C-alpha cells in the first residue's frame, strides 16, 4: 500500500504528560484521543494501546515512551506519554527533551507527590518552556475549598521551580469519566473539560521558534534494519532541515565521523520530503551497517559538530531536598554524563582552589568522558549516579 504524505497545514507542537505514578497520565492521554476522535482529529487510543511496550505488561507500569498523534482546530500535536516511575527516569530525560510543553497531571484527591516534584524539577532542568496542569479525578472531590488548596499547592511547586505558577492554567478534569462518556461534546460535563484542557494547551503552550536555518542535527535514539532496504535511525530533528539524498556525518562514540547518505525519510509511517526541527523521524541510511550505528551517536551536517572527550561546563549540583546527593564530591569524581540519548562514564576536574562540591552548589568544572561524544557549546547534559540525577549542566567550552 502506498504511504500517505504527511500533512503540514497546521503548526506542529510536541507535548507530553508528566506526573506521579497512578495519577492518571495514560488515562488522560486516552481521554484526549477519545474526545478529539469525535471530530476526526485523532484515532482513539485505549489505555492498553498506549501502555504498549513489552516490558510494561508484567508490572503495570508505563516504562517506554508512547508516541500519539492528534490535532486540534489550530494545531497538530505529537504527544508522548512519559514513564511515571522513578526507576525509569532515564527515559523521562530522553522524553522530556522532546517537549515544547508539558501537561502536568495531578490527582486532586492526592495532590503533588514525590514524582510530581521530581518531574517538575526535571522539565525545568531540560528547559521545557511551558506547563499546563490537568487536575485529575475531580469526580472524586466535591469540596471546593479542598480543590482550591490543591491548586494552590501545585502553583507553589511550579513557582519554586522557576515556572510562572500564578499564570499557569489549571483545568479540573476526570479522565476516566470523559473516557467512559466519550460523547465528545463541549457542553458535556466531563468531555467539555477535556476540550477546555486542549484549549489551554493550544493557547498557553507556545509553538516553539524552530531553528530551521542552523546546520542539521539529530541525536540517534534507536536503530533497526529493514530487509533489502538498509538501516533506519530514528530520533528528533533538533535543528536544520534534512532531505532525501542529503549527505550527513555520523558522529560519536567509537570512531571518527563518517559520511553517509540519507535515502528517504518517514514520520508516523508517512513519507516526508524533508524534516524540520521538532519532527520525530526515521531516516533510511545508505553506506552504514546496523552494527556501525547506535543510540547516543548523532547525525549532523558534514563538518558541523565534532566528537570530543574534554569540555568545560557550568554545572548545578542538586541539593539533597531536590533528590541529589547527600554528601559532597571531590576532584576526580567519576559519575555518568547523560548527553541527550546516552550515558557515558566520565571524570570531573574541579578548578584550582575548589576542594569539593557541596549539593546545592553551582560550579564551573572540566569534564572528560571515556569515549568521544558529539559536544558543542550550549549543549545540556545531566550528571547521574546510581540511577538518579545529581546535577544538571551546560557545556561552556569544548576543549579537545
From Swiss-Prot:
Residues 19-26 are annotated as: G1. Gene3D superfamilies: P-loop containing nucleotide triphosphate hydrolases, Translation factors. It catalyses: GTP + H2O = GDP + phosphate + H(+). Residues 136-139 are annotated as: G4. It is an enzyme of class 3 (hydrolase). GO terms for cellular component: cytosol. Residues 10-210 form the tr-type G domain. Its main location: cytoplasm. Mg(2+) binds at residue 26. Belongs to the TRAFAC class translation factor GTPase superfamily. Classic translation factor GTPase family. EF-Tu/EF-1A subfamily. Monomer. This is Elongation factor Tu. It comes from Dehalococcoides mccartyi (strain ATCC BAA-2266 / KCTC 15142 / 195).
Amino acid at each position: 500500500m502506498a504511504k500517505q504524505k504527511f500533512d503540514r497545514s497546521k503548526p506542529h507542537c510536541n507535548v507530553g504528560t508528566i506526573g506521579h505514578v497512578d495519577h492518571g497520565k495514560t488515562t488522560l492521554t486516552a481521554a484526549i484521543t477519545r474526545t478529539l476522535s469525535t471530530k476526526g482529529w485523532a484515532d482513539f487510543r485505549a489505555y492498553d494501546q498506549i501502555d504498549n511496550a513489552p516490558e510494561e505488561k508484567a508490572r503495570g507500569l508505563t516504562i517506554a515512551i508512547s508516541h500519539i498523534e492528534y490535532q486540534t482546530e489550530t494545531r497538530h500535536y505529537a504527544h508522548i506519554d512519559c514513564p511515571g516511575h522513578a526507576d525509569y527516569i532515564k527515559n523521562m530525560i530522553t522524553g522530556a527533551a522532546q517537549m515544547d510543553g508539558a501537561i502536568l497531571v495531578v490527582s486532586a484527591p492526592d495532590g503533588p507527590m514525590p514524582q510530581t516534584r521530581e518531574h517538575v524539577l526535571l522539565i525545568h532542568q531540560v528547559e521545557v518552556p511551558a506547563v499546563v496542569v490537568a487536575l485529575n479525578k475531580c469526580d472524586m472531590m466535591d469540596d471546593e475549598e479542598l480543590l482550591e488548596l490543591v491548586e494552590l499547592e501545585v502553583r507553589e511547586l511550579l513557582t519554586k521551580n522557576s515556572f510562572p505558577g500564578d499564570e499557569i492554567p489549571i483545568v479540573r478534569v476526570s479522565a476516566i469519566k470523559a473516557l467512559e462518556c466519550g460523547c465528545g461534546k463541549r457542553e458535556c460535563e466531563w468531555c467539555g473539560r477535556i476540550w477546555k484542557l486542549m484549549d489551554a494547551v493550544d493557547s498557553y503552550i507556545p509553538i516553539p521558534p524552530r531553528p530551521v536555518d542552523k546546520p542539521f542535527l539529530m541525536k540517534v535514539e534507536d536503530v533497526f534494519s529493514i530487509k533489502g532496504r538498509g538501516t533506519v535511525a530514528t530520533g528528533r530533528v533538533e535543528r536544520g532541515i534534512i532531505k532525501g539524498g542529503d549527505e550527513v556525518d555520523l558522529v560519536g562514540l567509537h570512531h571518527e565521523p563518517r559520511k553517509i547518505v540519507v535515502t528517504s525519510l518517514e514520520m508516523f509511517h508517512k513519507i516526508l520530503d524533508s524534516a524540520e526541527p521538532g519532527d520525530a523521524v526515521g531516516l533510511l541510511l545508505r553506506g552504514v551497517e546496523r552494527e556501525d550505528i547506535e543510540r547516543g551517536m548523532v547525525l549532523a551536517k558534514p563538518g558541523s559538530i565534532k566528537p570530543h572527550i574534554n569540555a568545560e561546563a557550568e554545572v548545578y549540583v542538586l541539593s539533597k531536598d531536590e533528590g541529589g546527593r547527600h554528601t559532597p564530591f571531590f576532584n576526580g569524581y567519576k559519575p555518568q554524563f547523560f548527553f541527550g540519548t546516552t550515558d557515558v562514564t566520565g571524570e570531573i576536574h574541579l578548578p584550582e582552589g575548589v576542594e569539593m562540591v557541596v549539593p546545592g552548589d553551582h560550579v564551573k568544572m572540566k569534564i572528560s568522558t571515556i569515549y568521544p561524544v558529539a559536544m558543542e557549546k550550549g549543549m545540556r547534559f545531566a550528571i547521574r549516579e546510581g540511577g538518579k540525577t545529581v546535577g544538571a549542566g551546560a557545556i561552556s567550552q569544548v576543549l579537545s
